[in-house]
């Protein structure tokens, strides 16, 4: 029943975009910000398919979601707790109150950018009387980068052949410019990444169990995302398909995208920025070198490590919030 209802809504959303273009994206973005479950992201990614410009679609979606969020704010302010509880449940009211007390306007930014239910945050912003200007600015800061990133991803998918050529060019640019010093150092940096991540995580856990648990959660989530993507994308290693690769390590036939070493290195480094700024900067520098080493030794493409960086930074940021407490059963 729920699944069928969702598919009906999706079909209606697709009809709106297919027939009304940017107006359809605006309507979807506006309504998703306070009530309906279909996000505009999928239509921004597929904008080219509908004959639309991805960047313009992202901007239209940002305007729509900002105005829709303000409408949700108004509903929360005027209708209050009883209607909110009927629509979303009492659980979200209590968790939302805890979230707002801890993060304030930053909670709006987090919900706008992340998979957290933004519509719930919009209602709660009105219920808890957040300043309208702060709410609006927080929405734009959270939503605009997200939609632009989605638009860029959609543009990349639409130009996959050109992207592949750039990826190979950058791989050779790094891998073919080698010297005996880097040939000695880079394999060591690459091979010791996992042991260093494990040892550092253990030390952090012993010194600060609460943060250590968050770090382990972030690393586990990053690993699962990277592992799943590897076998979903199933991109072969560069040394299996390209000629004249300067190969210093061998990862067998394991898929290439994304780089697991880079993913976990950036998860650790980003997490440590919230634990100790100096330590975080030190490990961030190390993570960048790890990413470079994976291309240098011939086992990854530049896009593999770029994807690993993005996943790692995202998962590392989760140590900043008690996300596993706040989005139970979402």
From Swiss-Prot:
Q: Which SMART domains match?
A: acidPPc
Task: Give a Pfam family name.
Answer: VTT_dom
Superkingdom in the source lineage:
Archaea
Recorded GO terms, molecular function? sphingosine-1-phosphate phosphatase activity
Q: What is this protein called?
A: Uncharacterized protein MJ0374
The species this protein belongs to is Methanocaldococcus jannaschii (strain ATCC 43067 / DSM 2661 / JAL-1 / JCM 10045 / NBRC 100440) (Methanococcus jannaschii)
Lineage of producing organism: Archaea, Methanobacteriati, Methanobacteriota, Methanomada group, Methanococci
């Amino acid at each position: 029943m729920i699944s069928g209802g969702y598919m009906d809504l999706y079909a209606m959303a697709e009809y709106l975009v297919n027939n009304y273009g940017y107006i359809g994206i605006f309507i979807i973005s506006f309504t998703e910000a306070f009530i309906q479950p279909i996000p505009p992201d999928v239509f921004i990614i597929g904008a080219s398919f509908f004959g639309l410009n991805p960047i313009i679609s992202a901007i239209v979606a940002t305007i729509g979601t900002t105005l829709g969020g303000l409408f949700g704010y108004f509903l929360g302010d005027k209708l209050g707790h009883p209607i909110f509880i009927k629509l979303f449940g009492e659980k979200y009211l209590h968790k939302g109150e805890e979230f707002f007390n801890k993060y304030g306007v930053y909670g709006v930014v987090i919900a706008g950018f992340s998979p957290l239910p933004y519509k719930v945050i919009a209602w709660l912003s009105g219920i808890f009387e957040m300043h309208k200007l702060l709410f609006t600015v927080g929405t734009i800061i959270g939503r605009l980068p997200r939609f632009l990133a989605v638009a860029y991803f959609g543009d990349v998918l639409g130009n996959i052949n050109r992207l592949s050529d750039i990826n190979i060019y950058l791989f050779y640019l790094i891998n073919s410019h080698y010297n005996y010093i880097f040939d000695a150092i880079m394999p060591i940096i690459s091979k010791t990444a996992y042991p260093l991540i494990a040892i550092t995580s253990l030390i952090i856990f012993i010194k600060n169990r609460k943060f250590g648990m968050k770090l382990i959660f972030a690393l586990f989530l990053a690993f699962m995302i990277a592992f799943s993507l590897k076998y979903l994308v199933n991109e072969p290693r560069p040394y299996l398909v390209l000629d004249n690769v300067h190969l210093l390590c061998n990862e067998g036939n394991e898929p290439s995208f994304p780089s697991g070493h880079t993913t976990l290195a950036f998860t650790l480094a980003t997490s440590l920025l919230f634990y100790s700024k100096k330590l975080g900067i030190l490990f961030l520098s190390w993570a960048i070198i790890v990413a470079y080493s994976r291309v240098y030794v011939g086992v990854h493409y530049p896009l593999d490590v770029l994807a690993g960086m993005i996943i790692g930074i995202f998962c590392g940021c989760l140590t900043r919030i008690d996300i596993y407490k706040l989005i139970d059963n979402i």
